[in-house]
């Protein structure tokens, strides 16, 4: 593992001198100094030794260009984590052989070589082979010591978590993770909407539109795909910095509503009705928007945002200050405690209303 620490890229050289780039990290352990990674090639895996016994011979093998194999003796075999072998060796192999495979007389892998100057050992390669990534592996302190991309888990639910956590990565790693997700899980909406959101933030409206239409064509949850399309159209139309590009792409509030309606027709989820209500408000039909927001307070998505939106409708409808304040009080009452940063817009809106009413205390 040590060679990967601080590295932005790495190469593996096989016995024929062929070099392969390391594509992703699949796991690592600092204590045993082992790592699991994927290279940009398909190769035939060596066989693991079915058993290892003390007082047997082994060979520490490097690519032939780097030198001949060095013989070692397995002095002692210890178990760790109940099923893996840790072999103490006697050998003349130096630290430059660290990470090399240790093979038995049959060419089967006994372990991964490590020398710290005073102790020579081989850690069971099956231990590294059994590493399994989870979504939270994106924030694993050990794996973050390397600049090489952490791979996505195999399970879709875990991969979705990994995709979300990759938002903090540098641009190249973030984009590689998104593209990897799209390749591995082409029928899930998460990859498409993540990419489209990123494209939209960069002002690439046409590419975002193309990505969202691909989602509608390829994903299994069509309602979610239509909702994401409508939501990002709405975002594009109402964001001043990209409004002109959105208009040029044919994005309008009516188009956003059509997508929201299609999503709701496929699956009458409250979140889709919420998008419809937001579009109605933006189009200036404040009474209908208020009615729609109010209806949503009787659904599972009852939250502070709905009451803030109802307060905004009340203001547009010239309701009394007290009526607006009542809605904003509901906002604050629904905020989770202890209060988090996400609650600040609701406290700010209420404070502004108090100021408007002359209630400065």
Language-model features and meaning:
Residues 190, 224-228, 269-272, 305, ...:
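Start-of-helix register in tetratricopeptide repeats
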Residues 197, 231, 238, 278, ...:
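Residue-level recognition of tetratricopeptide repeat
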Residues 112-179:
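C-terminal cap/linker of serine protease catalytic domains
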Residues 44-87, 92-98, 113-123:
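Flexible, gly/ser-rich surface segments that form the specificity/activation loops bordering the active-site cleft
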Residues 1-30, 127:
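Catalytic-histidine neighborhood of serine endopeptidases
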Residues 186-187, 220-221, 265-268, 301-302, ...:
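Short coil turns that delineate tetratricopeptide repeat
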């Amino acid at each position: 593992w040590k060679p990967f620490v601080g590295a932005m890229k790495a190469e593996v050289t096989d016995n024929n001198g062929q070099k392969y780039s390391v594509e992703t990290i699949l796991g690592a352990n600092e204590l045993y100094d082992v790592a699991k990674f994927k290279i940009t090639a398909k190769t035939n895996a060596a066989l693991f030794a079915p058993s290892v016994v003390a007082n047997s011979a082994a060979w520490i093998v490097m690519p032939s260009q780097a030198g001949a194999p060095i013989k070692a003796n397995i002095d002692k075999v210890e178990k760790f984590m109940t099923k893996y072998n840790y072999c103490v060796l006697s050998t003349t192999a130096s630290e430059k052989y660290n990470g090399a495979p240790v093979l038995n007389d049959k060419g089967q892998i006994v372990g991964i070589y490590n020398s710290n100057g005073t102790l020579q050992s081989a850690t069971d390669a099956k231990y590294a082979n059994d590493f399994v990534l989870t979504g939270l592996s994106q924030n694993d302190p050990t794996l973050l010591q390397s600049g090489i991309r952490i791979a996505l888990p195999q399970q879709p639910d875990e991969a979705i978590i990994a995709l979300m956590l990759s938002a903090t990565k540098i641009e190249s790693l973030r984009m590689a993770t998104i593209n990897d997700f799209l390749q591995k899980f082409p029928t899930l909406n998460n990859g498409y909407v993540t990419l489209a959101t990123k494209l939209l933030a960069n002002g690439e409206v046409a590419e975002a539109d193309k990505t969202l239409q691909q989602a509608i064509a390829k994903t299994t949850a069509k309602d979610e795909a239509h909702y994401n399309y409508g939501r990002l159209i709405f975002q594009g139309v109402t964001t001043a910095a990209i409004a002109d590009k959105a208009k040029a792409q044919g994005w309008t509030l009516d188009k956003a509503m059509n997508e929201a309606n299609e999503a709701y027709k496929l699956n009458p989820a409250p979140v889709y009705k919420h998008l419809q209500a937001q579009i109605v408000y933006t189009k200036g039909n404040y009474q209908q928007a208020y009615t729609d927001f109010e209806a949503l307070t009787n659904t599972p998505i009852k939250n502070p945002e709905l009451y803030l939106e109802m307060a905004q409708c009340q203001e547009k409808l010239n309701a009394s200050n007290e009526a607006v304040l009542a809605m904003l009080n509901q906002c604050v009452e629904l905020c989770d405690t202890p209060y988090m940063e996400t609650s600040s817009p609701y406290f700010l809106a209420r404070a502004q209303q108090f100021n408007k009413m002359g209630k400065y205390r």
